């Protein structure tokens, strides 16, 4: 499947100065009998070092880029095309530079290619020595390459060092057209990341700044909640798909988010000391007792022991009313308070009156006088 000479020439004109390798023009194997190609039409890295006026295809410029960067024989639009070519075939193939065709043979050895690259390197060094002032102005700009990626078009020193390193190494694996845009993109990316990082770090703080109105520590309770939902909960409007506010923190740790909300279900008679004392959870209605404030101090019924009841009955049999001194003595003897002794005697007198009233109705009133203690003040 060999192609004719006309077809080959049309293909080379179609691909614009034959950016494909020399071994890819006439099939998979070189040396297939077609040797009538013009080597001057092929612009490779190792040929035409002094063709400033006859510029090759901008997608594949030669090694001597110094005159083009300084503005000699190349306008700004073409220079922009040199920089912005992300899909170069040299980077797609793997960065291997095509071999030049010399003396009617295909596949020049790599050592001869290095020898052909040396004149272009000497020319670059001469141009660098002729413009020492430009180099001194551009050397400080190398340190500012990360912060100012737009100034890379004015820094030929960086590209000159890369070309010299690629020529001395003789490997040619560094794609000339792919590395500078990659550095440009990476430096711009890191610069944008550094510029946007403090913005995003300070953004939640700015959005959570309104939580200082009534909520002490919202970030500890709900870091994963959306700020919009938090704002709606503060304004009294629950977010879409959110559970009720009364059930939001039931069973969780510190539900501090609902202490200052207008839509809280806690009744207005909540103890104000619960918030100021630093309690971990507010006092919900089911935690409160069913009695009012005045009834909360009511004590339960005192259960007297059999010994206490026996001693009190003995004292009541002799005296219905007790003096202050006797009340204190009985309180110390029975380990009770004076109030308990006084209440017990009051209840016991009411019981005694009921008993006397029922007993005095069927008979005479003399029976009631017999039950009355003799020393009781009536």
Curated annotation (Swiss-Prot):
Keywords: Developmental protein, DNA-binding, Homeobox, Nucleus, Repeat. It comes from the Eukaryota. InterPro entries: Antp_homeobox, HD, HD_metazoa, Homeobox_antennapedia, Homeobox_Antennapedia_CS, Homeobox_CS, Homeodomain-like_sf. Residues 297-356 bind DNA. GO terms for molecular function: DNA binding; DNA-binding transcription factor activity, RNA polymerase II-specific; RNA polymerase II cis-regulatory region sequence-specific DNA binding; sequence-specific DNA binding. SMART domains: HOX (SM00389). Residues 48-132, 230-287, 352-378 are annotated as: Disordered. Residues 101-132, 243-281 have a biased composition (Low complexity). A motif (Antp-type hexapeptide) lies at residues 283-288. GO terms for biological process: anterior/posterior axis specification; anterior/posterior pattern specification; heart development; lymph gland development; midgut development; muscle cell fate specification; negative regulation of transcription by RNA polymerase II; neuroblast development. GO terms for cellular component: cytoplasm; nucleus. The keyword Repeat applies. CDD domains: homeodomain. It is found in: Nucleus. Loss of Antp results in altered development of the embryonic thoracic segments. Overexpression can cause antennae to be transformed into legs. Sequence-specific transcription factor which is part of a developmental regulatory system that regulates segmental identity in the mesothorax. Provides cells with specific positional identities on the anterior-posterior axis. Belongs to the Antp homeobox family. This is Homeotic protein antennapedia. It comes from Drosophila melanogaster (Fruit fly). The lineage of its organism: Eukaryota, Metazoa, Ecdysozoa, Arthropoda, Hexapoda.
């Amino acid at each position: 499947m060999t192609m004719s000479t006309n077809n080959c020439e049309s293909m080379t004109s179609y691909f614009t100065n034959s950016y494909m390798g020399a071994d890819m023009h006439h099939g998979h194997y070189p040396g297939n009998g077609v040797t009538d190609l013009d080597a001057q039409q092929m612009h490779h890295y190792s040929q035409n070092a002094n063709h400033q006026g006859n510029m090759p295809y901008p997608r594949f410029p030669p090694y001597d880029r110094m005159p083009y960067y300084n503005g000699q024989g190349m306008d700004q639009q073409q220079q922009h095309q040199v920089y912005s070519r992300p899909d170069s075939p040299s980077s797609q193939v793997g960065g291997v530079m095509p071999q030049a065709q010399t003396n009617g043979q295909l596949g020049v050895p790599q050592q001869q290619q290095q020898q052909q690259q040396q004149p272009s390197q000497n020319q670059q060094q001469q141009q660098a020595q002729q413009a020492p002032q430009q180099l001194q102005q551009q050397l400080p700009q190398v340190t500012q390459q990360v912060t100012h990626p737009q100034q890379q078009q004015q820094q030929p020193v960086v590209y000159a060092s890369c070309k010299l390193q690629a020529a001395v190494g003789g490997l040619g694996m560094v794609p000339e057209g792919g590395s500078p845009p990659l550095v440009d993109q990476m430096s711009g990316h890191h610069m944008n990341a550094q510029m946007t990082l403090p913005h995003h770090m300070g953004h939640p703080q700015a959005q959570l700044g309104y939580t200082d109105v009534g909520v002490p520590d919202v970030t500890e309770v709900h870091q994963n909640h959306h700020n919009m939902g938090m704002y709606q909960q503060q304004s009294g409007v629950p977010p879409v798909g959110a559970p009720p506010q009364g059930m939001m923190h039931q069973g969780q740790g510190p539900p501090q988010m609902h202490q200052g909300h207008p839509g809280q279900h806690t009744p207005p008679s909540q103890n104000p000391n619960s918030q100021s004392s630093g309690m971990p959870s507010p006092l919900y209605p089911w935690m409160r007792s069913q009695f009012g404030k005045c009834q909360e101090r009511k004590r339960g019924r005192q259960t007297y022991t059999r010994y206490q009841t026996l001693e009190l009955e003995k004292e009541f049999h002799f005296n219905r009313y007790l003096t202050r001194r006797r009340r204190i003595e009985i309180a110390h003897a029975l380990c009770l308070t004076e109030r308990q002794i006084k209440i017990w005697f009051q209840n016991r007198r009411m019981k005694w009156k009921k008993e006397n009233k029922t007993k005095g109705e069927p008979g005479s009133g003399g029976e009631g006088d017999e039950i009355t203690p003799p020393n009781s003040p009536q």
